[in-house]
């Protein structure tokens, strides 16, 4: 509104100037010259005032925010992997929050718009203005938004629940998408992760937490798949894993790379995403053929993986370790019953152990009743040829393979694994 008013006033002054200095048969008199000078000075003053038009402003609810600094920071993630990442974004500017909770940034950033920025608040005593919290979307301390040249942004938020309470007055369509993404993230967090402890001690609890995390990540990736806006999609991908670990959602990341590199092939972030999602940088995907590696078997023989798969209807390639408590639990509670139920019908398990000690390996196999199925290990710990060939970093992991060695599904555990095997063996 202020910009429109400036334009109207400029137009009025311009017309008056034309009237003062318009050609005449007579010379311009002294009074006309003084009027011309006055109008010129007023014109310059107005231009200077309008050039200081606030582009980003807002109101912060400070109640209950005694632990927070009365400051707002503006941060730019210059690369894709800097989005939602602590200590990486470049601090562009800062603004004081007054006692009434108001703040404003007068000078727009000299950036090629549209560009993703992050508005950040910090606790008292925090010396890094670009520290971003990602533990709890209800209280996280930043919000990403898109700066569009010529458009002012007006923010409202509760400083102690910054991300959850963040709102924009009359948001643009692209920023409306980010607000919708925030709402979806909050819903997914409350449904799947809230109350879950990262230090969950029980073996079953660890597997359940992994399942919940996957469900949370999938909701964010589904948003990225459904939106037509590039920058909100990039935020969704980063919120799915701020630490950049996409091993368990590799197929979803690959699909996103395919989508956005077709639409924005020249955008630097699309290129970064393409590099991350290169198949050589991801674990083997559903639909890929498993590498035909020569495996040292428990009995001392070396056999190619494809040879072990031949003539089977369904094979579980299980990557485990004697020291992996969730793996051991799955041996006893899931794999033993499945093997007993379906082995005679063409169901096989090939277990590869990340072992350094043959004795510990053998003891675990016998104790779990896992000596029913096939076992292999290079006895090189987690630095071994199979992990390298599968491009894996995390266990427990499994791959369900058809008779050709093609991956049908990955990383199914507990009831999900039972249901897949039951359905597959009954249908074929």
What function would you assign to each model-found segment?
Residues 313, 319-334:
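Conserved redox-active cysteine motifs that mediate thiol-disulfide chemistry
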Residues 226-230, 262-270:
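Short solvent-exposed coil/turn linkers within tandem alpha-helical repeat scaffolds
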Residues 294-315:
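A short beta-strand-turn-helix
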Residues 228-242:
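Amphipathic alpha-helical repeat scaffolds of TPR domains
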Residues 328-368, 379-388:
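Structural microenvironment flanking redox-active thiols in thiol-disulfide oxidoreductases
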Residues 1, 9, 13-17, 21-59, ...:
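Bacterial Sec-dependent N-terminal signal peptides
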Residues 370, 378-423:
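Thiol/disulfide oxidoreductase modules built on the thioredoxin-like
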Residues 51-208:
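A non-transmembrane, solvent-exposed segment enriched in polar/low-complexity residues
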């Amino acid at each position: 509104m202020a910009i429109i008013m400036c334009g109207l006033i400029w137009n009025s002054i311009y017309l008056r100037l034309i009237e003062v200095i318009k050609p005449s048969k007579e010379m311009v008199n002294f009074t006309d010259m003084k009027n011309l000078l006055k109008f010129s000075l007023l014109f310059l003053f107005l231009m200077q005032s309008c050039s200081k038009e606030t582009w980003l402003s807002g109101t912060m609810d400070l109640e209950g925010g005694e632990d927070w600094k009365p400051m707002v920071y503006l941060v730019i993630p210059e690369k894709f992997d800097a989005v939602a990442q602590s200590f990486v974004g470049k601090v562009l500017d800062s603004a004081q929050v007054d006692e009434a909770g108001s703040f404003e940034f007068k000078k727009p950033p000299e950036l090629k718009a549209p560009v993703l920025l992050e508005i950040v608040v910090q606790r008292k005593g925090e010396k890094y203005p670009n520290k971003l919290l990602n533990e709890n979307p209800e209280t996280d301390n930043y919000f990403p938004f898109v700066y569009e040249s010529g458009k002012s942004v007006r923010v409202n938020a509760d400083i102690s629940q910054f991300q959850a309470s963040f709102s924009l007055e009359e948001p643009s369509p692209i920023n409306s998408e980010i607000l919708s993404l925030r709402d979806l993230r909050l819903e997914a967090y409350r449904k799947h992760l809230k109350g879950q402890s990262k230090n969950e001690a029980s073996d079953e609890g660890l597997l359940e937490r992994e399942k919940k995390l996957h469900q949370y990540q999938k909701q964010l990736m589904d948003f990225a798949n459904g939106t037509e806006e590039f920058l909100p999609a990039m935020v969704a991908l980063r919120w799915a894993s701020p630490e950049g670990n996409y091993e368990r959602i590799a197929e979803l990341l690959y699909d996103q790379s395919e989508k956005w590199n077709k639409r924005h092939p020249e955008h630097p972030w699309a290129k970064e995403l393409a590099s991350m999602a290169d198949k050589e940088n991801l674990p083997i995907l559903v639909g890929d053929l498993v590498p035909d590696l020569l495996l040292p078997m428990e009995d001392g023989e070396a056999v190619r993986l494809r040879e072990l798969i031949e003539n089977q209807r369904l094979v579980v390639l299980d990557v485990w370790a004697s020291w992996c408590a969730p793996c051991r639990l799955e041996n006893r509670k899931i794999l033993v019953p499945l093997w007993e139920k379906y082995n005679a019908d063409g169901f096989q398990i090939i277990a590869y152990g990340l072992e350094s000690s043959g004795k510990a390996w053998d003891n675990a196999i016998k104790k779990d009743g896992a000596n029913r199925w096939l076992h292999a290990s290079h006895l090189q710990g987690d630095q071994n040829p199979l992990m390298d060939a599968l491009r894996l970093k995390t266990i427990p992991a499994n791959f369900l393979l058809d008779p050709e060695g093609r991956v049908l599904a990955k990383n199914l555990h507990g009831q999900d694994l039972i249901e897949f095997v039951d359905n597959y063996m009954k249908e074929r």
